[in-house]
Swiss-Prot record:
Annotated organism of origin: Homo sapiens (Human)
Keywords: Leucine-rich repeat, Repeat
Secretion signal span: none
Entry superkingdom: Eukaryota
Family label: Belongs to the PRAME family.
GO biological process: negative regulation of apoptotic process; negative regulation of cell differentiation; negative regulation of DNA-templated transcription; positive regulation of cell population proliferation; proteasome-mediated ubiquitin-dependent protein catabolic process
The protein, known as: PRAME family member 13
CC per GO annotation: Cul2-RING ubiquitin ligase complex; cytoplasm
LRR repeats: 97-124, 179-203, 204-230, 231-265, 266-291, 292-323, 324-342, 348-375, 376-400
Record gene name: PRAMEF13
Molecular function via GO: ubiquitin-like ligase-substrate adaptor activity
SUPFAM superfamilies documented for this protein: RNI-like (SSF52047)
Xref: InterPro entries: LRR_dom_sf, PRAME, PRAME_domain
Length: 474
C-alpha cells in the first residue's frame, strides 16, 4: 500500500492563492518568482481568467511564450490575457517589476515551461534561479517601445478564425502601442482584399517567411507589391499556383519589371520558390538580376521557360552558391541545356539537391549537363525520373556519377527500350534492363537508395497513376 506524499509548502501556497481570486490579485505584484510559473500554469489549466489577467500585468520575465502552453488558441483565455496587456499598456504608473516585452503565441519554446516540470513539482536551487534571472533580465527597452505579439498566421478561409479576428481587432485598436509580429505568413484561399487588411495590421518588417497560393499574378503584383517592399527581413518567399489571365507578352513584361523591383530591398532572402513559372517565361532575367542576396534554395517548377531564361541563371552572382535547385516539371525538351550545364559547373561546390524530375529532357540533350553534374561533389539528392532516356544514355549518366560519393537518394526513368506504344513500362523487358543498369552503376560506386523506373515519390509515397510501383533497387 503506497502512502501519498503530503503536499509541499509551495503547492499549498499556490492552492491558497487560487482559491481566493481576490487575494491572488492583490498579491500578484509581490509574488516571488519561484511561485509565478507554477501558479500561472495552474490558473491557465483551471481557466481562472481573472487571475490570468492580473498575472500578465506583473509578469516577471521579458517574454511570455504562451503558444507552447496553449497549442490551440482559446478565445476566452486570449481575451483574458489581452485584457491584462491592455491594462498594462494604459497604466500611467507601470508596475515597478514590469518586464514583459513579448507575448509569443507561436509553439516555439517548450523548454521555458519544461524548466518548471508540472504545475507544482518545482525543484529550485539558488544557482539555477540566478542563472535563469540572468538569462531573462536582459537590458530593458525604453518605456515607449511597442509591446510585441508574435504569431504564425495561416489564412485559409473567410470568415477568419474567431481568435485571429479578435487579435487583429485588438492590435488595430492599439496602433503604436503594439506590434503584431508574424514570422511566418501563409495565404491559401483568402481573397486579396482580406489579405491586404491583414497586412495593414501586421508589422511587415517581422515577416521572415511568406507563402501565397492560388492568386492571379497581375492582381498580386498590383495590390501586394507595396507590402512586399516593406518585408525587409524576408528569408523565404513562396508563390504556389499563381496564375495569369493575360496573353499580352508586353504587359507581362511590364508587370514582371514592377514585381522584380521588390527584390532590390530583400537583402536576407535565401529561398525563392515559384510553382507555375510560365508567367515569367521570357522575362526571368528581370527578376534574377534584382536578387541582392546569394540564394541557397531556388525552385522554379511546373510550366516552361525559354533558353534565354535558363541562360540567365548562370550569369548572376546571387545564384552562385545554390545548395538546392528544383526545376521539376519545367519542360526543357525544346531548348539547349548548355546554359543549365554552365549553371551546374558554377554551383558544383555547393549543390546538395538537384531535382530535374519530369522535365522531359531527351537523351540527345544529356551530354550538355553531364560535365557539370559530375563535379557536384556535395550532391546528396538527385531526382531525374520522368525524362526520355535511352539505355545507352542512362548508362552514360550513371557512369558520370562515379565521383558523387555523398549521393544518398537518386531516381532515374525507365529506359525508352522498355516502354510500349502507350509509353507504359513493359515489365518483362524492363526488369533485366534495370538489373543491367544496376550492374553498370556498381562498377563505379556503391549506391545507397536508388529508384529506377516508374515510382511513387520517395519522400511521400504518392504516385501519379495506379500503374506506378515502388522499386527499391538497392
Amino acid at each position: 500500500m503506497s502512502i501519498q506524499a503530503p503536499p509541499r509548502l509551495l503547492e499549498l501556497a499556490g492552492q491558497s492563492l487560487l482559491r481566493d481570486q481576490a487575494l491572488s490579485i492583490s498579491a500578484m505584484e509581490e509574488l516571488p518568482r519561484v511561485l509565478y510559473l507554477p501558479l500561472f500554469m495552474e490558473a491557465f489549466r483551471r481557466r481562472h481568467f481573472q487571475t490570468l489577467t492580473v498575472m500578465v500585468q506583473a509578469w516577471p520575465f521579458t517574454c511570455l511564450p504562451l503558444g507552447s502552453l496553449m497549442k490551440t488558441l482559446h478565445l476566452e483565455t486570449l481575451k483574458a490575457l489581452l485584457e491584462g496587456l491592455h491594462m498594462l499598456l494604459t497604466q500611467k504608473d507601470r508596475p515597478r517589476r514590469r518586464k514583459l516585452q513579448v507575448l509569443d503565441l507561436r509553439d516555439v519554446d517548450e523548454n521555458f515551461w519544461a524548466r518548471w516540470p508540472g504545475a507544482w513539482a518545482l525543484s529550485c536551487f539558488p544557482e539555477t534561479m540566478s542563472k535563469r534571472q540572468t538569462a531573462e533580465d536582459r537590458p530593458r527597452m525604453g518605456e515607449h517601445q511597442p509591446l510585441k505579439v508574435f504569431i504564425d498566421i495561416c489564412l485559409k478561409e473567410i470568415p477568419q478564425d474567431e481568435c485571429l479576428r479578435y487579435l487583429f481587432q485588438w492590435v488595430y485598436q492599439r496602433r503604436g502601442l503594439v506590434h503584431l509580429c508574424c514570422s511566418k505568413l501563409v495565404n491559401y484561399l483568402t481573397p486579396i482584399k482580406h489579405l491586404r487588411k491583414s497586412l495593414k495590421i501586421i508589422y511587415l518588417n517581422s515577416i521572415q517567411e511568406l507563402e501565397i497560393h492560388n492568386m492571379s499574378w497581375p492582381r498580386l503584383i498590383r495590390k501586394l507589391r507595396c507590402y512586399l517592399k516593406e518585408m525587409k527581413t524576408l528569408g523565404k518567399l513562396v508563390f504556389s499556383r499563381c496564375h495569369h489571365s493575360t496573353s499580352d507578352n508586353e504587359l507581362e513584361g511590364r508587370l514582371v519589371t514592377k514585381f522584380s523591383s521588390v527584390f532590390l530591398g530583400l537583402e536576407h532572402l535565401q529561398l525563392l520558390k515559384i510553382k507555375l513559372i510560365t508567367f515569367f517565361s521570357g522575362h526571368l532575367e528581370q527578376l534574377i538580376r534584382c536578387l541582392q542576396n546569394p540564394l541557397e534554395n531556388l525552385e522554379l517548377t511546373y510550366g516552361y521557360l525559354l533558353e534565354e531564361d535558363v541562360k540567365c541563371l548562370s550569369q548572376y552572382p546571387s545564384l552562385g552558391y545554390l545548395k538546392h535547385l528544383n526545376l521539376s516539371y519545367v519542360l526543357l525538351f525544346r531548348i539547349s541545356l548548355e546554359p543549365l550545364g554552365a549553371l551546374l559547373e558554377k554551383i558544383a561546390a555547393s549543390l546538395e539537391t538537384l531535382i530535374l524530375e519530369g522535365c522531359q529532357i531527351h537523351y540527345s540533350q544529356l551530354s550538355a549537363i553531364l560535365p557539370g553534374l559530375s563535379r557536384c561533389s556535395q550532391l546528396t539528392t538527385f531526382y531525374f525520373g520522368r525524362n526520355c532516356m535511352s539505355m545507352g544514355a542512362l548508362k552514360d549518366l550513371l557512369r558520370h556519377t562515379s565521383g558523387l560519393s555523398k549521393l544518398s537518394l537518386e531516381t532515374y526513368p525507365a529506359p525508352e527500350e522498355s516502354l510500349n506504344s502507350l509509353v507504359r513500362v513493359n515489365w518483362e523487358i524492363f526488369t533485366p534492363l534495370r538489373a543491367e543498369l544496376m550492374c553498370t552503376l556498381r562498377e563505379v560506386r556503391q549506391p545507397k537508395r536508388i529508384f529506377i523506373g516508374p515510382t511513387p515519390c520517395p519522400s511521400c509515397g504518392s504516385s501519379l497513376s495506379e500503374e506506378l510501383e515502388l522499386h527499391l533497387c538497392c
